[in-house]
Amino acid sequence: MRLKMYLAIRRAKKYMKEHNHPGRMIVTDKEIEEWRQRTRNMDRDCLTVEENLKKGLNIEKVELPNTSGWLISREGNPEDKVLYHIHGGGFINGCTKMAFFFLSHVVNKWGYNVFSVDYRLAPDHQCIDTITDCEDGYKYLLEHYKPENIILMGESAGGNLVLGLPHKLKDDGLPLPKGIISDSPVVQFVHYPYSYYENSCKTDFGIIFGINEAVLGIYQGDLPVDHPYLSPLCGDLSGYPPVYLDASNKESLRDEARMMYVRLKEEGCDVEYHELKDFFHAQMPNIKSHSTLKEQHPLILSFIHRMWGTNEK
């Protein structure tokens, strides 16, 4: 194991040297402004997506205290159940409109209605703002659904948030959802597990060395690095609802999901973990991928049906 770790570190350092990578993420003011502009452009470009997807779907914008959410439904789907989707994007970009293709697929093909929140993003907002927006979305759902009829679902940064949100709900005395679906989550920012050394700059060029420091620099705010809102792995996981976890064997965050699985098992939680072979990071929303539709989505649907006692279609 030590030899494999040593060789992985050497490979990563060689890649960084060849590509002029400093070995850590340096976030400049120029890059921050570029992120802001990119987010504005994505939001603008997705407006036509919203219009196209209105055909056959009911799309309702919901105003929340500091942001907004979207309820996407279809006639014939169970009216008493909802999947609460929290999008990914590294905490710095992404929006519901970008996820509409995936969400419309869920509503049309999975047969369940979806709510999604446009939480506030770094660098203009920090973790406490983001988790508060996610909680506000959940509070809205509690006005219309029983907690046992709500399942959280998210990928990457969203996978982190669906695991961190129950910590906030427990702190505030709110009922927990029926279940959690977390795809390729980052679960802590305390250290880099082995899969970073093994896969970063080899099979995963998206989640690379230094990303923790970059995210913490613009997203952490005043929270300690091991605060459960930021690092769900580090909190009290007792009493957590059933959890579905997955990650690719080839991604940097693989061991994050493994660690979360072990911690949840230690707490006696109902948890299942699926390691997907040769997948990309956070592949759940990619409905253009054959492997996503044929390998990953059936596993997720099986979990949903088990949670709600519904029949598989």
Model-derived features: positions:
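A glycine/proline-hinged amphipathic helix-loop "lid/cap" segment
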Residues: 1-75, 309-313
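Alpha/beta-hydrolase superfamily serine-hydrolase fold, recognizing
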Residues: 27, 60-70, 74-313
